[in-house]
């Protein structure tokens, strides 16, 4: 049997929150059935049990051990993990209330893509999961939940971001003035503040932030501090933001990061989301891109409606994809079935630049090889089949520079907007924390 790629295994352990017993003085779940069923939080109409919390915490500790991160105190991690579970439940509940659904057909497609990305069939992938101790039924539900939260972010945050022409002008002027685009690797800690926080709450949060900052500047492991203090989704990954030019970082982080030397930690920063600490891990030079990669693609679009559900549209496109795989011409199928204006041209979209299409479409297109046909892809416009015909590098014209700038600014704003949305959602969700109750 094929073995699972370690990185995929790591992600699955993180997503599913499953895992074996640890060498820590911590059991994967309490032995006492009464303790296991104890409710540690009420989130709207849902509850979180102690068993769920300990199962998730076991996986988190296993992840931190693999990374070689020194472990924070157990009670600190327990509280941090419960807050993450509360945020997940709040999002899932909001998704249900607003009609966000992932049907089995869409779920099967997603799992098929995960398996294919790991060079396995779905049965092979399922066997590999079960060999690692991951129950397939639970894995499916966790993936379904992940898909709901991603769709929520796209609907509630991504689609509402607005980039003005003035912002683009300022971005391009700054790029011209600097002549280069250095990249920064930042790590961060976020202490999220309630939307209507009282002065007492803010003072308590500030003191907590100052405590974390003092320990960071004393040389304590930043990843450990992130796991112990941060409310950000990437807390268990050390708060690592990866390599980004300043233009693609939240403005607050870009300003702070530009003043730091490698290894230095910022002051305690304040934003509408709460308090932040930023560490510059490293910095490297670069130059502003003189060209972009263009993609020549075509697609077939079927829109869902009151008379055609998303599942039915998906099945219809799957049948089209199978015919194409058996030798039927893509352009012919586009003319017959596509509901896009490009149907008459066989689905031709011409040469596309970064930012020309919606993010869901672009991500799927960028992952394809030449002549490869995608699985069914969902975007705000409907369901798509995408085929990449060619790729090329082209000089960035003034128009294209603006498109690239728009995308960079969008990425910069997205993190801030998402954190604001999460904070607002948390504040309007009824939450009762019972962790300390015996």
UniProtKB/Swiss-Prot annotation:
- Which enzyme type, at the first EC level? isomerase
A single MF term (Gene Ontology): peptide binding
Signal sequence coordinates = 1-28
| GO cellular component terms given for this protein | outer membrane-bounded periplasmic space
* Protein keywords: Chaperone, Isomerase, Periplasm, Repeat, Rotamase, Signal
Q: Which EC number(s) does UniProt give? A: 5.2.1.8
Q: Where is the PpiC domain?
A: 181-282, 292-390
BP term (GO), one: protein folding
Q: Where in the cell is it found?
A: Periplasm
Catalytic activity as recorded in UniProt: [protein]-peptidylproline (omega=180) = [protein]-peptidylproline (omega=0)
What does this gene product do?
Chaperone involved in the correct folding and assembly of outer membrane proteins. Recognizes specific patterns of aromatic residues and the orientation of their side chains, which are found more frequently in integral outer membrane proteins. May act in both early periplasmic and late outer membrane-associated steps of protein maturation.
According to its record, what is known about the domains?
The PPIase activity resides only in the second parvulin domain. The N-terminal region and the C-terminal tail are necessary and sufficient for the chaperone activity of SurA. The PPIase activity is dispensable for SurA to function as a chaperone. The N-terminal region and the C-terminal tail are also required for porin recognition.
| HAMAP family attached to this UniProt entry | Chaperone_SurA
Q: What is this protein called?
A: Chaperone SurA
Phylogenetic lineage: Bacteria, Pseudomonadati, Pseudomonadota, Betaproteobacteria, Rhodocyclales
């Amino acid at each position: 049997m094929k073995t699972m790629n370690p990185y995929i295994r790591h992600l699955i352990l993180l997503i599913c929150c499953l895992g074996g017993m640890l060498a820590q003085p911590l059991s994967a779940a309490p032995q006492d059935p009464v303790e296991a069923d104890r409710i540690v939080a009420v989130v709207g109409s849902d509850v979180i049990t102690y068993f769920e919390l300990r199962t998730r915490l076991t996986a988190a500790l296993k992840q931190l051990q693999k990374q070689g991160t020194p472990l924070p105190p157990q009670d600190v991690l327990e509280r941090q993990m419960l807050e993450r579970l509360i945020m997940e439940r709040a999002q899932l509940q909001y998704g249900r209330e607003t009609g966000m659904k992932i049907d089995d057909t869409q779920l099967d497609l997603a799992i098929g893509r995960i398996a294919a990305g790991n060079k396995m069939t779905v049965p092979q992938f399922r066997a590999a999961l079960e060999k690692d101790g991951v129950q397939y039924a639970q894995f499916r539900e966790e993936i379904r939940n992940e898909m709901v939260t991603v769709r929520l972010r796209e609907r509630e945050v991504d689609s509402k971001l607005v980039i003005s022409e003035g912002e683009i002008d300022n971005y391009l002027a700054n790029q011209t003035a600097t002549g280069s685009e250095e990249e920064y690797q930042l790590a961060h800690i976020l202490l999220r503040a309630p939307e209507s926080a009282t002065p007492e709450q803010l003072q308590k949060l500030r003191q907590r932030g100052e405590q974390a900052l003092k320990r960071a500047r004393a040389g304590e492991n930043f990843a450990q501090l992130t796991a112990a203090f941060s409310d950000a989704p990437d807390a268990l990954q050390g708060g690592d933001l990866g390599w980004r030019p300043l233009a693609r970082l939240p403005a607050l982080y870009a300003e702070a990061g530009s003043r730091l030397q490698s290894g230095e930690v910022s002051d305690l920063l304040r934003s509408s989301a709460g308090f932040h600490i930023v560490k510059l891990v490293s910095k490297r030079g670069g130059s502003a891109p003189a060209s972009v990669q263009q993609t020549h693609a075509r697609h077939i679009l079927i829109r869902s409606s009151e008379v055609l559900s998303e599942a039915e549209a998906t099945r219809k496109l799957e049948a089209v994809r199978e015919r194409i795989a058996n030798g039927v011409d893509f352009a012919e199928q586009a003319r017959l079935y596509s509901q896009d204006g490009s149907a008459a041209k066989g689905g031709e979209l011409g040469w596309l630049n970064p930012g020309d299409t919606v993010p869901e479409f672009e991500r799927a297109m960028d992952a394809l090889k030449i002549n490869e046909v995608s699985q069914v892809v969902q975007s705000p416009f409907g369901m798509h089949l995408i085929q990449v015909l060619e790729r090329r590098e082209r000089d960035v014209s003034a128009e294209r520079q603006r498109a690239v700038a728009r995308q960079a600014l969008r990425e910069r704003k997205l993190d801030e907007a998402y954190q604001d949305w999460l904070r607002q959602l948390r504040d309007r969700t009824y939450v009762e924390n019972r962790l300390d109750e015996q």
